[in-house]
């Protein structure tokens, strides 16, 4: 089946997003009469006999689901669908990066559709409220802008080898320092704190603070910057928070802003923490000091490498499917388990995925280092595994993910009414 022939039945794919959004439980309200005709056309081309789904939206759907599952698990029957030529035009055998957003369009006419196309994300369902999940694999849903909602800095703090965690540092900062100039960089709700603890006076002058990786992906708006000695409601030992009007001004600079930003004023500041170090010019000698940045923190999309590499931005990758496709597969998975077909179908999907990837390689072969550790219905994790194949061209990896996404969406639609005899 060429892409042109597939476009003749594209109403089915266009209806997928509306189907999975509007269908709930036993309700079936996603497809139109035109979609029924498209379904009939597609099943004819798939050599699947008529399921009679037009006259009854319930029982025939069960038959249709059963036949589709049988079809998808027989690689000799669906082999054409796994080849990259499935998406190729008769006259122009190429696939653009925005194939999904160009041909599988939500029928809800969400005004954000242009944003979806610009972000070039993979998910199709419109989101009622775009928001950031701090503990996800950083493949955002189609309408989730990574910098759309504030984030608490303490949720991003990440301990690494040789570094004490954020909360354990609370007890350490309570303890009087035993030496001069002990630097620290911590986070709490709405605030980032950095400074130097000391048991003796620290002279005025220039001091530099390295911005850790977890903070380098943040920007802050409307921030107050001031001296403090409080961390999570406890008192930091070895710092001086008091100041007088006669004190010389203390300023600091960040890599993304060449201006001297004031400390201890009513000024509201907005700046990015990405790019390197904070350089602070201490105006007056203090026995240690702590500078607080208090404001609304958000993630910088152009600085968060996790957003592009699909690695977790807060912790090791977790089992969170942020495409929501697993929600629509729940009923299907329950039926597979109930009838003892779960392992059989999983093996079939693993073979299907490997066949699909092989078809994109030249010469056809499984790429070196490819190993799936997640189940087939965890689409985001499989996408991350595919996109991590550095020895495969990035555009090819993208096409693999988009191709697998369409097939998974089809299973989400048809598998909902799967009831094996």
From Swiss-Prot:
It comes from Rice dwarf virus (isolate Fujian) (RDV). GO terms for molecular function: host cell surface receptor binding; structural molecule activity. Pfam families: Phytoreo_P8 (PF07124). GO terms for biological process: fusion of virus membrane with host plasma membrane; symbiont entry into host cell. This is Outer capsid protein P8. Belongs to the phytoreovirus outer capsid protein P8 family. Capsid protein which self-assembles to form the outer icosahedral capsid with a T=13 symmetry, about 70 nm in diameter and consisting of 780 molecules capsid proteins. Coiled coil: none annotated. InterPro entries: Capsid_hemagglutn, Phytoreo_P8, Virus_capsid_a-hlx_vir. GO terms for cellular component: host cell cytoplasm; host cell cytoplasmic vesicle; viral envelope; viral outer capsid. Homotrimer. Homomultimer. Interacts with host peroxisomal glycolate oxidase (GOX). This interaction mediates its relocation to virus factories peripheral to host peroxisomes. The keyword Secreted does not apply. The keyword Magnesium does not apply. Keywords: Capsid protein, Host cytoplasm, Host-virus interaction, Outer capsid protein, Virion.
């Amino acid at each position: 089946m060429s892409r042109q022939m597939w476009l003749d039945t594209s109403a089915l794919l266009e209806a997928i997003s509306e189907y999975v959004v509007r269908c709930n439980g036993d309700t079936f309200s996603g497809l139109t009469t035109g979609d029924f005709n498209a379904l009939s056309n597609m099943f004819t081309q798939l050599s699947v006999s008529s399921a009679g789904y037009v006259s009854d939206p319930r029982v025939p759907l069960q038959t249709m689901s059963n036949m589709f599952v049988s079809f998808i698990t027989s690689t000799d029957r669906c082999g054409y669908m796994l080849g990259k030529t499935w998406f190729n035009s008769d006259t122009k055998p190429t696939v653009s990066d925005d194939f999904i957003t160009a041909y599988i369009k939500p029928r809800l006419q969400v005004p954000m559709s242009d944003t979806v196309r610009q972000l070039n994300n993979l998910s199709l369902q419109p989101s009622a409220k775009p928001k950031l999940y701090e503990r996800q694999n950083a493949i955002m849903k189609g309408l989730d802008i990574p910098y759309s909602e504030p984030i608490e800095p303490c949720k991003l703090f990440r301990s690494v080898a040789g570094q004490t965690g954020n909360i354990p540092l609370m007890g350490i900062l309570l303890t009087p320092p035993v030496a001069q100039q002990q630097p620290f960089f911590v986070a709490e709700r709405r605030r980032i704190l950095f400074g130097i603890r000391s048991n003796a006076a620290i002279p005025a002058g220039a001091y530099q603070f390295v911005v850790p990786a977890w903070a380098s992906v943040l920007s802050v708006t409307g921030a107050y910057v001031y001296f403090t000695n409080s961390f999570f409601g406890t008192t930091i030992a070895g710092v001086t928070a008091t100041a007088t009007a006669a004190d010389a001004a203390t300023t600091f600079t960040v890599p993304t802003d060449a201006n001297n930003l004031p400390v201890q004023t009513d000024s509201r500041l907005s700046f990015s923490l990405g790019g390197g170090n904070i350089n602070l010019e201490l105006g007056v000698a203090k026995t240690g000091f702590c500078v607080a940045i208090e404001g609304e923190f958000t993630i910088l999309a152009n600085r968060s490498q996790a957003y592009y590499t699909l690695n977790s931005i807060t912790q090791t990758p977790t089992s969170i499917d942020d495409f929501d496709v697993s929600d629509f597969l729940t009923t299907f998975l329950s039926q597979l388990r109930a009838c003892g077909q779960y392992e059989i179908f999983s093996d079939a999907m693993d073979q299907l995925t490997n066949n699909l990837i092989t078809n994109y390689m030249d010469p056809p072969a499984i790429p070196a280092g490819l190993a799936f550790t997640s189940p087939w219905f965890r689409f985001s994790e499989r996408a991350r595994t595919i996109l991590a194949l550095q020895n495969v061209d990035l555009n090819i990896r993208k096409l693999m993910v988009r191709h697998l996404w369409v097939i998974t969406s089809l299973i989400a639609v048809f598998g909902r009414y799967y009831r094996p005899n």
